[in-house]
Amino acid sequence: LMRKEKKNDLSRDEKKELADLHLQKASFDKELENWNKNRNAEDFVKLRDMYNDAGVKIYGFKPNYLLRKGNSDANINYAMQAGKALGASHVTIELPEDPTHSLKLGKLAQKNGIKVAYHGHTQQHINWWDTALEQSESNVLNPDLGHYIAAGNTDTFEFIKKFSSKIYSMHIKDRKSLANGQDNMPFGMGDTPIKEALQLMRDNKYSFPATIEYEYKTPDDSTIIEELKKCVAYCKNALDS
């Protein structure tokens, strides 16, 4: 509707609909302004305790919007303090294209006593994080093994070994390689060396978590929960063999 408004191409009903949306946004902005005045990162301690009581430890937190370029220092500090209150060792965001922002995030992370782990998709390669790592000890990695393979990289184990002390968490999924079409596949059916990567972590006693990220199409005769059980079993079998 806003694009059509710029072209002066709105019907009478669309003008009314857009006016209603503007009113809703103004109301939401007012509520958000009031919330910002009273927000407290310590409120996240209650959420952490709820998860801990259920046997779940929160190791990472992705307040993606609040970490993006253009946000105020206050918003970024709040996001990092919330992550720390949750018990996370790091907050995550896609590695910014603008290196001045990763520099800023690194400085604020150091101030808040937490790390910023930079995620990637098919932009990833072994040198992709170099600038951010040089900028601050608080800048670390949150790579994605499946996307790394889909990007056409063939140095997976070299990459993991090189950055083992800088990887704070890693997503695992099974994707086809760039040459084979990059599709997301059930575990064990793609080109991603999940089994070998997990065994490398085990044998070298790397302590960072590997997180299953479910992205392949759920078969018609199955459910996401059933498929996740298969993913977990695949990983357990890899570690037991």
Give the positions of each predicted feature.
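Histidine-acidic metal/acid-base catalytic patches
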Residues: 3-6, 10-23, 29-32, 36, ...
